[in-house]
């Protein structure tokens, strides 16, 4: 009987703790942070010239030669660009 009470109490504490963690996660929306604080930019977002690691994931590389846009923006990488970024060892995911 004591075991059942302790188990039930533990489950209640675990449920309350997990709800508070989820609330904290919702408060911090990564899209609201500037690029420098996020660590990387999503596709079609501004990036740092010459730094493919400034684009998130293995799919994104920084492109500064877009014919219709001034500046540098993340684009979807081709096969060779993906391999080059993989070997570069970028820390962001």
Curated annotation (Swiss-Prot):
Excised during maturation, the propeptide residues are 19-38
Q: Which UniProt keywords apply?
A: Disulfide bond, Secreted, Signal, Toxin
Q: Which residues form the signal peptide?
A: 1-18
Tissue expression notes:
Expressed by the venom gland.
Q: What is this protein called?
A: U12-lycotoxin-Ls1d
List the GO molecular function terms: toxin activity
**UniProt-annotated location(s):** Secreted
